[in-house]
């Protein structure tokens, strides 16, 4: 009798997404394109910034950051108006340690997939990593250093704003506008497939790197159904590879 009561309670609390599902899908697709703008524009601007004056570089950085903040406002407001999850859970020490565990798991998956990619294809980086690395390599060319305002903007996009927007969209909005509250497997798999497809995967191994990353991020989100957890894991993951390059740039810039 107790089991039946619990089952009925779960069914009654299994909330449906708000709005029309077809419209929600179209909005989701549009937002995929929208969230590419901040990091895309900043990476395009980076190599050209060596030719810009200091004032132009600062103005461009402010413009890119302003556009990014506007997009965050739009995407966040849409998410908050459609979510069926509690958005005000605190981040305790236990949660931080668990998220670091998810980060380590994601890094292990990435290393194993990269090793397989090297063995079977001879490539040691994915197309997405290569594109970002080529941009970041500019930061260590001491004769043609980009202005610090543009560099700080790129780092901000890669480490903070990019992960923030991607988690809002690929975990939060995708799950909570297209699936019922307690659905797991379908949003887990499909969101990870879509996430991987957005990272320029060119072979099965590079696809696996981002698919498994998407899986780990979804598990981080699903643990408490709190988007802040997957955001933290994603931001830490991007920062691990980006911040050392930024520190090297700062050392060259202020020498």
Positions of PLM-derived features:
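N-terminal, membrane-interfacial amphipathic/helix-forming hydrophobic leader that caps
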Residues: 1-119, 242-255
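Helix-boundary and loop/linker segments of multi-pass membrane transporters
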Residues: 16-18, 87-92, 139-149, 180-182
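Hydrophobic alpha-helical transmembrane segments
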Residues: 25-29, 58-59, 96-104, 152, ...
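Functionally important transmembrane alpha-helices
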Residues: 40-41, 192, 196-197, 204-255
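Hydrophobic core segments of transmembrane alpha-helices in multi-pass, intramembrane catalytic enzymes
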Residues: 63-68, 157, 209-217
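Transmembrane alpha-helical segments in integral membrane proteins
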Residues: 70-76, 154-180
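Membrane-interface interhelical connector segments
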Residues: 121-147
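Membrane-interface helix/loop boundary segments of multi-pass membrane proteins
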Residues: 165-190, 219-229
């Amino acid at each position: 009798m107790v089991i039946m009561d619990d089952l009925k309670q779960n069914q009654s609390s299994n909330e449906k997404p708000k709005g029309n599902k077809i419209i929600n899908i179209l909005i989701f697709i549009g937002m995929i394109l929208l969230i590419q703008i901040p990091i895309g524009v900043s990476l395009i601007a980076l190599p050209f910034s060596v030719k810009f004056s200091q004032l132009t570089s600062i103005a461009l950085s402010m413009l890119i950051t302003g556009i990014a903040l506007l997009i965050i406002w739009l995407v966040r407001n849409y998410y908050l108006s459609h979510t069926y999850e509690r958005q005000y859970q605190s981040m305790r020490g236990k949660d931080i340690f668990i998220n670091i565990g998810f980060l380590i798991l994601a890094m292990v998956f990435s290393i194993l997939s990269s090793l397989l990619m090297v063995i079977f294809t001879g490539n040691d980086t994915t197309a997405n990593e290569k594109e970002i690395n080529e941009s970041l390599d500019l930061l260590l060319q001491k004769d043609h250093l980009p202005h610090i305002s543009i560099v700080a903007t790129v780092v901000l996009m890669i480490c903070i704003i990019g992960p923030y927007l991607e988690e809002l969209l690929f975990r939060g909005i995708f799950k909570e506008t297209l699936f019922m509250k307690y659905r797991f497997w379908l949003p887990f798999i499909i969101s990870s497939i879509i996430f991987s497809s957005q990272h320029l995967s060119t072979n099965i191994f590079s696809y696996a790197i981002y698919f498994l990353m998407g899986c780990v991020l979804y598990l981080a989100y699903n643990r408490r159904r709190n988007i802040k957890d997957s955001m933290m894991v994603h931001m830490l993951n991007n920062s691990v590879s980006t911040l050392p390059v930024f520190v090297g740039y700062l050392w060259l810039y202020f020498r």
